[in-house]
Amino acid sequence: DIDFPGELSTPDIYRTMDDLKSFGVPVLILSGGEPLLHPDIFAISAHAKSMGFYVGLSTNGTMIDEAMLPKVAAIGYDYVGISLDGIEATHDRFRRKDGAFAASLRGVRLCRDAGIKVGMRFTLTQDNAHDLPALIALADEERIDKFYLSHLNYAGRGNKNRGSDAHF
């Protein structure tokens, strides 16, 4: 909903996908920011699927509700990864929004219950490392069989937060 300097137009995205396919790239992970905010995300996703890419969606999950779920399911994403930055208050603080954890978890559950291959994504920092065991337990309780653990990426807001990266 907000144009960013240098952001590709949808036709440019399609041309880039053509190039990636010609180079033999097998997988596209659509991420952001928040990819579900892009007005053409479902057209882009459908186009990628029609080209034979393995297509993943990396989202914060808050927009996946009962109204959005059929659109997500119709694409047939090979994988939907939903970011959880901690348990409840930790996640809400990271996302700067009260209720973000509940909304993200709702997205996980809706995808799971619809038969969409869904996983939890967790970026480890000093500020959320204490929640890692509880998140792994949550994934088990929710019958989510994929848990993706990553380090802080020093790009965008992550670069501003580089001091909070986990150090062991």
Where are these regions (language model features)?
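Conserved alpha-helical substructure of the radical SAM core
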Residues: 1-79
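Radical SAM enzyme [4Fe-4S]-AdoMet core and its adjacent flexible, acidic
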Residues: 3, 8, 54, 74-75, ...
